[in-house]
């Protein structure tokens, strides 16, 4: 199996998706982070596709090559879109892998649609259980930080995306080996999305309370987080998510940034493979 396609959704919009690998293999479904596309998981898809798995990834609505509707950019709709895709492909015993915002999407998908089609899940640098600082989340990220992200998107999103990559990949740390090409790829992916969809998604990834969704994730779940994640702090998200999940395995990458699917791709690939096969 080697293809990409578009799925027309119930509301008339559509999802671009890739469906690679062995069609008879166990399906691994990837949900990407903001403001990226399915391309952000190409290292993992290539690796696991070569191991005999069926690997699937879509561009979230408002992102990449998917439709750019004015409305519907919230975690419930993202989860329902994912449910439509898994039903369309009739996936069974799937492993869902979500990075950053995609981790929230996976959690809400299971929270709303159950585990009937799901065998396992992996949350990488995920926004679960909630990012923003609230009364019940006093150690969260202040809302003013997300207001600044919104301002950056509106004022000059190309420049903002490029600047964001320094913290995203940890290139602002002493001794870090910067890849200008990776930074440019991030910007290119981000600019494919609609400004309205990406703007609205900031509220979705920062303010959605996913605590109850995590409690409903009764399947084995791998939590991977870098302890130097400057975008989604480990202490606020990864650590807390692992404590809430009923059946969690936590792996902390020492010195790991938010973009560990790229900066630590060999380690991510092997940890995912070991988890899927365990």
Where is each model-derived feature located?
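Short beta-strand/loop motif that positions the catalytic acidic residue
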Residues: 217, 223-225, 229
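Conserved HGGG/HGGXW glycine-rich cap/lid loop of the alpha/beta-hydrolase fold
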Residues: 13-71
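Flexible "cap/lid" loop of the alpha/beta hydrolase fold
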Residues: 107-112, 116-155
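Conserved alpha/beta-hydrolase catalytic His-Asp/Glu region
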Residues: 129-141, 151-215
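Conserved acidic catalytic loop of the alpha/beta-hydrolase fold
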Residues: 77-94
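Conserved alpha/beta-hydrolase "nucleophile elbow" surrounding the catalytic nucleophile
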Residues: 32-34, 94, 98-100
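Catalytic active-site module of serine/aspartate enzymes centered on a nucleophile-bearing elbow/loop
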Residues: 248-278
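Conserved alpha/beta-hydrolase "acid-adjacent" motif
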Residues: 230-236
């Amino acid at each position: 199996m080697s293809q990409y396609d578009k799925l027309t959704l119930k509301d008339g919009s559509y999802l671009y998706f890739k469906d690679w690998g062995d069609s008879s293999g166990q399906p691994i479904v990837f949900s990407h982070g903001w403001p990226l596309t399915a391309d952000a998981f190409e290292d993992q898809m290539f690796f696991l596709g070569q191991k005999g798995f069926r690997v699937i990834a879509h561009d979230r609505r408002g992102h990449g090559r998917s439709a750019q509707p004015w409305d519907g950019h919230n975690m419930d709709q993202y989860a329902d879109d994912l449910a439509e895709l898994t039903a369309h492909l009739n996936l069974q015993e799937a492993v869902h892998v979500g990075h950053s915002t995609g981790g929230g999407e996976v959690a809400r998908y299971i929270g709303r649609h159950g585990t009937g089609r799901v065998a396992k899940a992996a949350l990488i640098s995920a926004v679960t259980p909630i990012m923003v600082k609230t009364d019940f989340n006093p150690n969260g990220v202040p809302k003013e930080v997300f207001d600044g992200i919104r301002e950056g998107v509106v004022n000059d999103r190309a420049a903002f995306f490029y600047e964001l990559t320094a913290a995203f990949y940890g290139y602002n740390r002493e001794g870090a080996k910067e890849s200008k090409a990776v930074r440019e790829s991030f910007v290119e992916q981000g600019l494919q999305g609609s400004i309205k969809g990406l703007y609205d998604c900031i509220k979705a990834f920062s303010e959605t309370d996913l605590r109850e969704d995590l409690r409903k994730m009764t399947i084995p779940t791998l939590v991977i987080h870098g302890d130097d994640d400057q975008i989604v702090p480990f202490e606020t998200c990864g650590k807390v998510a692992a404590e809430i999940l009923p059946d969690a395995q936590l792996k902390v990458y020492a010195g790991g940034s938010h973009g560990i699917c790229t900066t630590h791709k060999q380690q991510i690939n092997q940890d995912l493979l070991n988890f899927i096969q365990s």
